[in-house]
Amino acid sequence: MDIVLPYGKEKTITLALPDENIFFIADRGHAPPLENPREEIKKALGKPVGLDPLRKLVKARDRVVIVGDDNTRPTPQSLIVPVLLDELNAAGVPDGNIKVVIALGTHRKMSEKEIKEKYGEEVFKRVAIINHDCKHPENLVDIGMAEIGIPVRVNKEVYNADFVIGVGNIVPHPLAGWGGGGKIIFPGVCDEKTVAMTHFVASKVRPLSKLMGRLDNEIRRIIDRVAAKAGLKLIVNTVLNQEDKISHFAVGHPITAFKEGV
């Protein structure tokens, strides 16, 4: 079996593996891309899964934080975030009350050039965009322990916000079952010890197929509880087809909409 891996921005590497060495395959299905994804986001925000329309969920004085992924993920933030900003403005929330926090986990900080490429010039000019800092305690808030003994410290900007929106992508994940949903918070905007211990605990599960591609598992349940405690109120998740084109948006309650997207 040939395995094609992305290498850099435009290249790929092909690995040939014997079929007997393939234990299982977790991949995205074939689905047609959306014809007008921007309009689909607007529709979904007007009728999110399990929630009232976004314009009814926020108040004009609210401090809103949008938590989005970094450039190691394919989520089209430059498409999604401008629509969110417009919807929040329509609800009375000015750009000055909105921040974007990039959920780096323990990844390196994105440069200004990379942020503009990922989020677009419009978003960069309209709102403050902050790289999550997993190392310095003054930028984190201790919110207690997860059930399996993991100390949880989250980004202070996120925790202190009145309304938190997570923007990510639903895809099979080896340690969480699926990426997306509350994973943008836990471990996305947690401290380095929280991130390390989360990966360590998940990596001890054997066989790997108990987690990867499984909707209901212990790690996902912890993710959901911590994300709720950190204040995640709404998710906008993409579902991409095998060509990385948007085939669906899962928008709404962080658990209900995530499950609908999976």
Language-model features: where?
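Short N-terminal or domain-adjacent regulatory/targeting segments
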Residues: 31-58, 257-262
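"Short basic amphipathic alpha-helical interaction patches in structured regions
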Residues: 78-85, 114-118, 178-183
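N-terminal amphipathic/basic leader segments beginning at the initiator methionine
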Residues: 1-43
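Histidine-anchored nucleotide/phosphate-binding helix
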Residues: 73-93
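Short glycine-rich or small-residue beta-strand-to-loop segments that form or flank ligand, phosphate
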Residues: 63-74, 99-105
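Glycine-rich phosphate/diphosphate-binding loops that line cofactor/substrate pockets in enzymes
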Residues: 49-65, 90-96, 230
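Acidic low-complexity segments
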Residues: 96-146
